[in-house]
A protein has these predicted regions:
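C-terminal membrane-anchoring or membrane-association module
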Residues: 740-752
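Short, hydrophobic transmembrane alpha-helix segments
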Residues: 1-7, 25-30
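Surface-exposed, glycine/proline- and aromatic-rich loop segments on solvent-exposed faces
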Residues: 288-351, 411-432, 437
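A cross-kingdom signal targeting lumenal/periplasmic-facing segments of multi-pass membrane
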Residues: 319, 323-395, 585
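Membrane-interface helix-loop-helix junctions at boundaries between adjacent transmembrane segments
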Residues: 30-105
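Accessory, solvent-exposed terminal regions and/or long lumenal/extracellular loops of proteins
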Residues: 268-278, 369, 422-724
Length: 752
């Protein structure tokens, strides 16, 4: 799952919740066993809220628990505690968010959540609440997605299998203290929450829509309970079995989730006149987003005849002349070179010398890494076709039209009549965009303007518009692409990182020590590393390769090391970052995402959100040079032994990350300094024999070579010399288990 958690935040959430609960329980003379309610709240916050601040988790947990007791004497909760904590974190701190796709869409995940959720709900008599919510929401999504928009069933299945919505349905909306007591009213209320969730998610594109609707609707529950009588639920009067299921189910779900870690298209599709067969196997896109304003710059790697080029891109509004321009393709080279995966070098000091320790970083890592990794390589009128030409423009070397259509068959026929070769499968992909009231940006080359420009290549196209939807329509691009395709997204915001909301956004493995000889093959190494990471994540995740503050006036380090100069004002202007002006100090945050997608694994367009996450990240790999000799002192001999062990780990890392089997070259690398280890001082024999058998990988079969996947997952440090520390995957489960043991101890003590 590769869930990006922080142990400190998890600990703070649990301790704050339990601490506040115990304080109120003491002053209100409530049994200590009520702290299990705080434990459930902690699970909800940990599973659904994201923030890069431990303080936000503590504040959310404290207010979530405290608000329950404000209404204690009225014997009802005004808000679901976890929901209240989540909304407080988002609305008050501006440093928290919800990641709808963080739990993925795996069938096993849904099965786990469903199984344990039903165990809880069947005991607390709230199964109907979850079922009504799910049936209503899933039915509405089916009607809109499949029947109305005419997307294929894979798109629908992807939407409804998001783990976060199942967590919400089975563990949050079903809270018996914040749902109506009357069963029929409760069912209508649950259906209303589902309708509101559907509306906000599909028409206002709000991430975490269910959380917002629940926050607004639970204050109505006391009024509904007053108007429509029903049996009041009371946790204290429930059976021990119910309480046992409630806590154990949530804890098992959390721990299972934590332990489950383990060629490109344009935004549109290329179309060609005559019978030219065009495939676009890579693309780069610049995304700039602030509020509802979006700027998209699309690279152009087309290499065919100019007369055969054309592109179709869905856009949400009719673009005006000033909303379209061409830019220099140099901007993509600048952003790629600056944010690409990189090498960093460290140098050991000879411990036999008394000089101060020297450990410095060089910035001469391969600046063209990303390139080496990514490079592969009877006439009717439009009215009769149901097509409207909303606007036409001449921009740069392109003739551009903005089209709207009533149905896909007519649009396809119109484009064919205009001389475009449309993929056979394009019609089924065009229909959903038409039903969504999207327009179509169509561009082809004006040969006269292109010839007069003096350039023998096509410039990137930049468009800008205002709309609530923040997405890239990749489905249209797959209409004429084969196999897997790569897209690099360079995103700029004022606030923080950009992440995908309908596919998981995961960090590429980084800060890993690899052998010195990896320098000469770094491009191939990173290609293999990405392929293995992509496969490990189920081939349906978006990978983060770089995230950093690049505000021109900011004095902090913008990378470590830098493989090129950071973007300057002219670069920001070219990329469409309109607020990065000479006289402005507004923040600019740069996110680089790498997407490898295919028809089978990415059935939906990419949906994005801007988060307040300002944590810096870069894909970097560490080369550590040995100290120069001689190594005649005891410390020098100990250093040589540790050097050999470290190099063995580096070779293992090279295999685990990139799949490079150890060979004679790696043997030589590991054992390079073994001859010097035989010259130890005689007194060193007191510590054992100084005879050393060189390690030989050739004596081990590939089948028996153990690959420590913890290195790949970032769960374990690979060297004591590494300047970065990784957490193991057991820290949070162990802590959660400790909290459970503490709660059960309190319960037993309270009974006595």
């Amino acid at each position: 799952m590769n869930w990006d958690y922080n142990l400190g935040s998890v600990v703070a959430t649990f301790l704050t919740s339990i601490g506040i609960q115990m304080i109120f329980a003491y002053f209100l003379s409530l049994p200590l066993s009520t702290i299990k309610s705080a434990l459930v709240t902690s699970f909800g916050l940990t599973l659904l809220l994201k923030s890069d601040s431990t303080l936000v988790f503590s504040l959310s947990a404290a207010l979530a628990i405290a608000q329950k007791f404000i209404f204690h004497k009225f014997r009802f909760h005004l808000w679901n505690p976890a929901n209240f904590g989540i909304m407080v974190g988002i609305l008050l701190t501006q440093n928290a968010w919800i990641s709808p796709a963080q739990w993925g869409t795996e069938t096993l995940l849904v099965f786990i959540i469903g199984t344990f959720g039903l165990a809880v709900l069947s005991n607390i008599k709230r199964l109907d609440t979850a079922l009504v919510f799910l049936v209503t929401l899933l039915s509405l999504e089916y009607i809109r997605t499949v029947l109305y928009l005419e997307w294929n069933i894979e798109v629908y299945l992807h939407k409804i299998s998001q783990g976060s919505i199942w967590l919400f349905a089975l563990f949050m909306i079903t809270d018996p203290m914040t749902t109506p007591n009357n069963k029929w009213v409760r069912r209508f209320w649950s259906g209303g929450v589902a309708i509101g969730t559907f509306y906000l998610a599909n028409f206002h594109f709000i991430n975490g829509a269910a959380q917002y609707i629940l926050f607004l609707s639970t204050p109505l529950v006391p009024l509904l309970n007053w108007a429509f009588k029903g049996k009041t639920f009371n946790w204290i009067n429930t059976t021990p079995m119910i309480k046992k299921h409630a806590i154990s189910s949530m804890s098992i779900v959390l721990m299972l989730l934590l332990l489950s870690q383990e060629a490109t298209a344009f935004c549109g599709f290329y179309v060609a006149k005559a019978d030219a067969t065009l495939f676009n196997q890579k693309s780069e896109v610049i995304l700039v987003r602030d509020g509802n304003r979006t700027v998209i710059t699309m690279s152009n790697d087309y290499k065919g005849e100019m007369k055969d080029f054309a592109i179709v891109v869905p856009v949400p509004v009719v673009l005006q002349d000033g909303d379209i321009k061409v830019v220099s393709r140099h901007i993509f080279q600048t952003l790629d070179g600056y944010s690409s995966p990189r090498l960093v070098e460290y140098y050991d000091q000879n411990p036999c010398y008394s000089d101060d320790y020297l450990n410095y970083s060089l910035s001469n890592a391969i600046p063209q890494v990303a390139e080496s990794v990514m490079m592969n390589d009877n006439v009717l009128t439009e009215k009769e076709y149901g097509v409207t030409v909303e606007a036409t423009y001449e921009v740069g070397e392109y003739s551009i039209a903005i089209l709207s259509a009533k149905e896909s068959e007519g649009l396809k026929a119109y484009l064919i009549q205009e001389g475009y070769k449309i993929p056979a499968t394009a019609e089924s992909v065009l229909a959903p965009y038409i039903k969504s009231n999207m327009k179509f940006f169509v561009a082809k080359v004006n040969l006269d303007r292109q010839k007069s420009s003096g350039f023998d290549y096509l410039h990137p196209i930049q468009i800008r518009f205002e709309h609530e939807k923040f997405m890239l329509p990749i489905r249209l691009g797959m209409a004429n692409s084969t196999g897997e395709q790569d897209m690099i997204v360079y995103a700029f915001t004022k606030k923080g990182r950009v992440e995908c909301t309908n596919y998981r956004t995961v960090k590429i493995p980084t800060d890993r020590n690899i052998p010195l000889y990896a320098r000469e093959m770094f491009g191939e190494f990173y290609k293999n590393l990405f392929q293995r990471a992509y496969s490990r994540e189920g081939k349906n995740a978006v990978h983060l390769e770089y995230a950093w503050t690049v505000t021109p006036s900011w004095g902090g380090t913008k990378c470590d090391p830098c493989v090129g100069p950071p973007p300057i004002y002219n670069d920001f202007a070219e990329a469409g970052v309109w607020w990065a002006q000479w006289n402005s100090n507004e923040n600019v945050f740069f996110t680089r995402l790498h997407v490898r997608y295919s028809n089978s694994k990415f059935p939906s367009d990419l949906q994005f959100q801007v988060t307040p996450n300002n944590e810096h990240f870069q894909a970097r790999y560490i080369l550590t040079h040995p100290a120069p000799g001689p190594f005649t002192c005891d410390e020098g001999q100990a250093y040589l032994e540790s050097l050999r062990n470290r190099r063995k780990l580096e070779v293992d890392e090279m295999y685990a990350l990139g799949g490079f089997m150890p060979n004679s070259k790696s043997d030589q690398y590991i054992n390079e300094f073994v001859p010097y280890m035989n010259n130890k001082p005689s007194e060193s024999k007191d510590r054992g024999s100084n005879e050393f058998e060189p390690f030989n990988y050739n004596e081990i079969s590939p089948e028996s070579f153990a690959v420590d996947m913890a290195y790949v997952n970032g769960e374990k440090d690979n060297s004591n010399e590494s300047p970065f520390k990784k957490e193991t995957p057991w820290d949070v489960p162990v802590f959660v288990g400790s909290m459970l043991a503490f709660v059960f101890f309190i319960q037993r003590f309270n009974k006595k």
